[in-house]
Regions:
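Active-site microenvironments in enzyme catalytic cores
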Residues: 4-183
Length: 183
């Protein structure tokens, strides 16, 4: 199933996409909901960020090719961490797929992007075992993780380099029922 958040006129709602049609739902995908009689052509609505989470996290340094690439750029030997480097991200950085990513005037020349697979968590959880983890995933969407590398190097944290407005494009929709082993 494909879920979206969309705007039609002044109305913002969640919807279910079927082919080229969006059916509005009451509630949200994460709580009780039901389809309404309101349908629109997908081409006639504005797709928004599919979900605005109160908090979200990013797992960095989580694949060998990226670690090797970054080490090569710095002229050092790659060091592979035992676990991903998880960092908090701010929802002010979220922007819909078709919206522009705005590079701040004071940014350096090292603004880079990385395509990401985003796991959308559908139920509140904490300290979940690896075996249970997928039970909490509602679905998947796409993300674009922009980073201002000069700020990352020079600031004491990654906050500004990773959380600048519009630096986290996400969407256009959430797909449920995907098997991560098949991606």
């Amino acid at each position: 199933m494909k879920w979206c958040r969309f705007q039609s006129g002044r109305n913002v709602a969640y919807g279910v996409i079927d082919g080229t049609t969006v059916t509005e739902v009451t509630g949200s995908p994460f709580e009780s909901h039901s389809k309404t009689a309101n349908t629109s052509m997908l081409s006639r609505v504005k797709l928004l960020v599919p979900v605005i989470p109160p908090t979200f996290y990013a797992a960095g340094v989580n694949y060998r090719e990226h670690v090797t690439e970054m080490a090569h750029r710095r002229g050092v030997k790659p060091e592979f961490p035992p676990n991903a480097d998880v960092g908090y991200r701010a929802n002010n950085a979220l922007v819909a797929t078709d919206e522009p990513i705005v590079i701040p005037k004071d940014a350096g020349e090292l603004v880079q992007y990385e395509g990401e697979l985003v796991a959308v968590i559908g139920k509140r959880c904490k300290k979940v075992s690896e075996a249970e983890a997928l039970d909490y995933v509602f679905g998947s969407t796409l993300g674009n993780d922009d980073s201002e590398r000069t700020w990352q190097r020079n600031d004491r944290t990654f906050w500004r380099g990773k959380n600048t407005d519009t630096f986290k494009a996400m969407g256009p929709w959430i797909v449920t029922g995907l098997n991560p082993d098949d991606l």
